[in-house]
Amino acid sequence: MKRTTFFQLICTALLLTGLSSCGWRREDIGPFQGDQQTFELANFDRLDMGSAFTITVQPGSAFRILAEGDRRNLDDLDVYTRNGTLYARYRNSRNRQYETSFTITMPTLRGVSFSGASQSSIAGFTNLNELDIELSGASKGQFAVQAKQTNLTLSGASNLQLSGLGAALGADLSGASTLQAFAYPVNDANLDLSGASKANISVSSSLDIDASGASNVRYRGAPSVKQRLSGSSSVQTD
C-alpha cells in the first residue's frame, strides 16, 4: 500500500514538472476583484473582439469604451484601433473564472467580427447603408438594426437573432450555425448553408438558396425561390 502511494506521488510530481516545462498556466482564481476600465479611443466604425467577452454596442454621438470585470483580466486586455477598427483581446491565453464585459458607444456601425464564444447585443443603429456581421467559435448575438444591405457569416455553431428592417440579406452559415431572422424582413435574400446549419428568414421578393449537409431553411413571405439542395437539406415555408 505504501509502495503504491509513493509511486502515485512520484507520478504526480513528474506530471506537474512536465506541465511547468511546457509553459502550462492555470488561473489563480482567488476572490473576485471587481473593477472597471475605460479606453480613450475614437474614430472607428468596426469591431473585432474575441476571448469570450460579453459585448453591448449602442449608438451615441461620442465614442466610449467601458470594460468591467475582474481586475486581473482587465490588466491583461489589449485594446487598440487600426484602420477604423477597434480590436480587443487578452494578451495571454489561459482559463478565466470571471467574465469581462464591454459596453461600447459609437456614432455609427459598419461591421463586427466576434469570436471565441462571445455573447453580444447590438441595438439602436438605423439607416445603415451596409452592415457586415461575422460570428465564429460558438458565439451568440442579438442584434436589432436597420440596414439596406446586411452581410452575415456565421460559423462554428454560432447563433444570431436578428430583428429590425433590411432591404437585402446575404448569409453564409456553416458548422451547425443558426440564423433566426423572422423579425428582420427583407426584399431579397441569398443564402449559403452547410454543415447542418439552419436559417429562419422573412423575404418578400426573391430568395436564392444553396444548402448542403442536412441544412434547413424556413421562410415567411411569397418570394420567388431558387434552390440548390444536397445532403438531405430542406427548404420549407413557415
Q: For each predicted feature, which ranges?
A:
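Short, ordered coil/turn segments that flank beta-strands lining enzyme active or ligand-binding pockets
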Residues: R82
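Extended, compositionally simple hydrophobic/Ser/Thr-rich segments
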Residues: D45-V57, F102-I104, L109-D238
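Short acidic/polar N-terminal linker immediately downstream of export determinants
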Residues: K2-T12, S20-L74, T85-T105, S121, ...
